[in-house]
């Protein structure tokens, strides 16, 4: 797959959270080829609750894997992965991104359960990255769980049967009147933006857009297949990113500083601490990251080889190919949980909501 982006949360009707527990172990370099200037980055990869299904939603989960390297203990850099030449164990499929920043690893056939793959190999073209054959190199392999969203038409907005703020709609004539209906995205072609029948439009009352158009064909609309993140960014994933940065970069992206929670102490389950001159740590590695400013988010995505998702892609990921429901949330209906959650195994990889409710979304807000 070629399109990558971040999704803060995607639960799609799940009644409880299952920890991802994605792990990369036993990283090594092997099979150096000094003629062509490449080596193989070898590692083991595992995660829980994996699936692939060819009917119904026809989707699967995957790991987005990328490599960072440094030469002689200097700055960490992003490794260039070759389109071909990698190796996968039985039952695994490898798809390297067109921009060579990383690769997707996923099931090659339908199935469910936990993944545990050993001796996965990616071909790193180190000479393309300006690394000498005899350089002393450190490498790190990072992995993020993703979900494949297949190509399909879908609807945005809920039309006259909802009262969302600044939602998408299209006008449809009903006798002497015009009604607001959901707008169907049926291709990646340019979309006309206008307050007219058959066009996409939206109000602009609360930090909305400029209502200008058209939306160009090159803009990701969600019709074509894409990947999105399965879970929120965890505190452990953030630390993995943060600890590869320079001192100056860390100071500008410090969630313990004035632009974040402004303390090394725990606040709202954020236990990230960054002692001066050291590496950041957390005692809640599996808990989602909070105190995230937009510039923090964009820096993490750029470092990961990902991009922000578009609003159109977000609605496709939540709704799929189903018809619109008035006032619906991301889980497909207008019901929200009306009580404070309690947890089992709080703070552990197998943490779960003990009282999720039935037919309600995983949210409590005012």
Question: PLM features: residue spans?
Answer:
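Structural beta-strand segments of beta-rich domains
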Residues: 37-41
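Extended low-complexity, serine/threonine- and proline-enriched intrinsically disordered segments
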Residues: 57-86
């Amino acid at each position: 797959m070629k399109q990558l982006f971040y999704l803060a949360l995607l639960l799609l009707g799940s009644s409880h959270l299952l920890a991802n527990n994605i792990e990369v172990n036993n990283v090594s370099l092997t099979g150096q080829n000094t003629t062509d200037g490449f080596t193989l980055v070898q590692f083991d990869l595992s995660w829980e609750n994996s699936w692939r299904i060819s009917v119904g939603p026809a989707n699967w989960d995957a790991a987005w894997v990328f490599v960072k390297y440094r030469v002689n203990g200097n700055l960490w850099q992003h490794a260039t992965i070759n389109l071909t030449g990698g190796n996968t164990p039985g039952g695994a499929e490898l798809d390297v991104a067109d921009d060579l920043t990383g690769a997707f690893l996923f099931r090659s056939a339908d199935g469910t359960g936990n993944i545990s793959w050993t001796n996965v190999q990616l071909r790193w073209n180190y000479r393309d990255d300006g690394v000498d054959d005899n350089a002393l190199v450190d490498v790190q392999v990072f992995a993020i769980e993703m979900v494949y969203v297949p190509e399909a038409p879908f609807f945005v907005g809920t039309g006259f049967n909802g009262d969302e703020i600044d939602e998408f709609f299209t006008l449809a004539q009903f006798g002497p009147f015009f009604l607001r209906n959901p707008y169907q995205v049926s291709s990646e072609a340019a979309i006309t933006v206008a307050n007219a029948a058959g066009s996409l439009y939206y109000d602009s009352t609360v930090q909305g857009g400029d209502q200008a158009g058209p939306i160009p064909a090159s803009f990701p609309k969600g019709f074509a297949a894409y990947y999105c993140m399965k879970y929120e960014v965890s505190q452990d994933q953030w630390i993995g990113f943060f600890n590869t940065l320079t001192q100056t970069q860390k100071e500008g992206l410090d969630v313990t500083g004035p632009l974040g929670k402004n303390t090394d102490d725990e606040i709202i389950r954020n236990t990230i601490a960054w002692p001066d001159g050291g590496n950041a740590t957390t005692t809640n590695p599996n808990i989602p990251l909070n105190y995230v400013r937009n510039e923090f988010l964009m820096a993490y995505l750029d470092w990961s080889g990902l991009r922000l998702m578009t609003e159109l892609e977000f609605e496709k990921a939540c709704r799929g190919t189903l018809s619109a429901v008035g006032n619906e949330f991301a889980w497909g209906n207008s019901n929200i949980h009306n009580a404070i959650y309690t947890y089992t195994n709080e703070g552990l990889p197998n943490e779960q909501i003990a009282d999720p409710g039935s037919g309600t979304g995983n949210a409590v807000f005012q």
